[in-house]
UniProtKB/Swiss-Prot annotation:
This is Small ribosomal subunit protein eS19y. Belongs to the eukaryotic ribosomal protein eS19 family. SUPFAM superfamilies: Winged helix' DNA-binding domain. One of its GO terms (cellular component) is plasmodesma. It comes from the Eukaryota. The keyword Ribosomal protein applies. One of its GO terms (biological process) is translation. The lineage of its organism: Eukaryota, Viridiplantae, Streptophyta, Embryophyta, Tracheophyta.
Length: 143
């Protein structure tokens, strides 16, 4: 008896790639004007090269909320942060941009994929969980 596949059953890389293309095709996420010039954090020296980086980040954030829940802007700043290169001085950890995380979370809320959690952060909605599981099922069927 075959059961439905969830996000936990498929490769994270394959899922994020497939869900990002799903978000791009659906047209519900509107790209802000600044996506081609903004850096993703203080630690970065250049803006992302991939023109679809915004969709990939949104898909990754939706997956993380699906798996853990209760994540807010501060948590995503820490997750997507990294080591800032200081030239000849030692590197140090820096958080990523909070504006990008906030904007993506607001977009996911308008699409009713995530909602505010009473305990803080965001959690996945039932329609959002169904949407993510459908994409995971398509990935599992292809492989």
């Amino acid at each position: 008896m075959a059961t439905g596949k969830t996000v936990k059953d498929v490769s994270p890389h394959d899922f994020v790639k497939a869900y990002a293309s799903h978000l791009k095709r659906s047209g519900k996420i509107e790209l802000p004007l600044w996506t081609d010039i903004v850096k993703t954090g203080r630690l970065k020296e250049l803006a992302p090269y991939d023109p679809d980086w915004y969709y990939i980040r949104a898909a990754s954030m939706a997956r993380k909320i699906y798996l853990r829940g209760g994540l807010g802007v501060g948590a995503f700043r820490r997750i997507y942060g990294g080591s800032k290169r200081n030239g000849s001085r030692p590197p140090h950890f820096c958080k990523s941009s909070g504006g990008i995380a906030r904007h993506i979370l607001q977009q996911l809320e308008t699409m009713s994929i995530v909602e505010l959690d009473t305990k803080g952060g965001r959690r996945i909605t039932s329609s959002g969980q169904r949407d993510l599981d459908q994409v995971a099922g398509r990935i599992a069927a292809e492989s």
